Amino acid sequence: MSTKKRRVLKIIILGDSGVGKTSLMNQYVQKKFTKEYKATIGADFLTKEIEVDDKKVTMQIWDTAGQERFQSLGSAFYRGADCCMLVFDVNNAKSFDDLDNWRDEFIIQAGPSDPDNFPFVVLGNKIDEVGVNRQVTEKKAKAWCASKGSIPYFETSAKEDINVEAAFTCITRNALRNEKEEELFVPDAVDMNTSATQRKRGGCC
């Protein structure tokens, strides 16, 4: 079996149930969106191969359940994460308030060596539904990100495919920028026979 030199990045998406984590992942990887809501049980992942700044990257994107009873997935799930997406619904204030808990949970479970410089990115999702019901302003979200060390922030819509690719490209660049200069060798053919078909933070681009 031949091998090809490429980087493998493990991306974990965290946030409350119903904020659109699965939809964002499906839109980015498969370019599809469904209105039907089906809660993720435990965790699931998809992979996507891309090229960023002349570097070949295999993104292993992990989508997690937002329900409390699944928050105890443990360090085994978080271990080896190269970057983390924190997602909230701009029309749901509680999902924004819970970002602190999700960020703390990740840092505790993943145990990054340098939490202050670990590559996070925050997505304010469902901007296609914005109207009188919007509860979290862009200014408020950016202020929270600034208070955590200038985390990049994107307003997204999985449904309309707004800023989805930009957000994933940003976090990939930051992960590559922060990773140690190690080369990972991965077999060309890896068939997970599941729904599977993506390392650290900083300014984007």
Curated annotation (Swiss-Prot):
Q: Which domain of life is it from?
A: Eukaryota
Cited Gene3D superfamilies: P-loop containing nucleotide triphosphate hydrolases
Q: How does it sit in the membrane?
A: Lipid-anchor
- Coiled-coil regions listed in the entry: none
Subcellular location, principal? membrane
Q: Which residues make up the binding site for GTP?
A: 15-22, 63-67, 125-128
Entry annotated with the keyword Cytoplasm: no
According to UniProt, the name of this protein is GTP-binding protein yptV5
| Record lineage | Eukaryota, Viridiplantae, Chlorophyta, core chlorophytes, Chlorophyceae
Source gene? Answer: YPTV5
